[in-house]
Amino acid sequence: MSDGLNSRLLRGSSRRKVYCKQPKCQNHLWLWLFFFNLKTNYMTEYIPGLAGVPATKSSISSIDGEKGILAYRGYSIQDLVEHSSFEETALLLMNGELPSPQELTNFKNTLNKRNEVKRKIRHLLWSLPSTGHSMDVLQTAIASMATFYPDAGASEPDSSYTQNALIKIISNMSTLVAMWTRISRGYDPIPPSKTMTYAENFMYMCFGEESDPEIVNLLDASLILHAEHTINASTFSTMVTASSLANPFASIAAGVGTLAGPLHGNANENVLIMLDEIGSPKNARKWIEDRLKNKQVIWGMGHREYKTKDPRATILEKMIKTYIKKNGLKLSNRFETALEVESICNELLSQKGVYPNVDFYSGILYSEIFNFTKEHFTSIFAMARSAGWVAHWHEQVSDNRIFRPTQIYIGADFRDYPAQ
């Protein structure tokens, strides 16, 4: 096989498709080469974005896109949201099994013990422009943590030193995100508590007061829903970096940078911008029809893995409705507009398998109920996803082979340097 081929092997064909760019291959012709493998037959073809291409074996999470099921280590997210906590879910993702009560208590204590950010990193955050995006700040801070843990590496992923570094990442994520919500607005950070839960502590560090337990429970559920989602772009980025045997801080920093993109974690910010642009439910149909006519994105709609509604979106929508009804609140204009957008998109796009994804309702939850500004949405997403990234880092380096895909070369043929 040519080293310049980005390909997928498909069972059931006796033909291999090879793109030749050597000078002797005039007009860059496709060559059909027939071959026989003793065990099976394969065909290779270029797959843009590696869509649907198996890149690894993993036991961390799974998706049934037809039925709309997401499970962590075999447990459905519905069950985890109803019965678990973010701390327990993080430990499940990391270790593969639900912890015992004592193991969970020990883990919570360790998270709280390690939730303070190093003084020099605190100074680093203060030195950055307050206008900086939270994801750029978070990526910088996570990468800098490696300088304090030089021996946390892939060569001994199960050592107590490396395991403590992994826990430090999860623990510091919430502190770093909360610090920037305040520093970016000119306020002093609030030191983390040593007794609160992960979700409770985050709200306290952001707002300086203990939050309503109902709000804390909603945040905890949201963190569970965002903790893991198989091989998405940011997780794959983390894995690719880990496959070079990079330290966990460099690998998770790569994931943070990838999550910042508008086609990934940043999408929930764009959903809120979209809803504000639509303005009210009565404007939704024309706005959507115009977008479809011009082949433009409708933010928060559609997911490559799901042929039905994203189960996380279903849970988030239900959570918001339950909270509003229980507290006798009026539907916000944004939420009413979102419901109308979903209704119209179901009418126009459901036959194409396009339904709301997790980003469609998460921004509303963050802004309308938690009172976070949209600039911090994606960093809160990263805070939750750190549990999944850490689990994938460990899984990757424990049975590693460096990722080295191939490509299809479409540049100039071999040529001589011009004579002087």
What name fits each language-model region?
Residues 22-33:
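N-terminal amphipathic/hydrophobic targeting modules at extreme N-termini
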Residues 2, 28-30, 41, 391:
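Short, low-complexity intrinsically disordered segments
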Residues 19, 34-36, 42:
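Aromatic (phenylalanine/tyrosine) cluster motif
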Residues 2, 6-19:
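N-terminal, intrinsically disordered charge-dense segments
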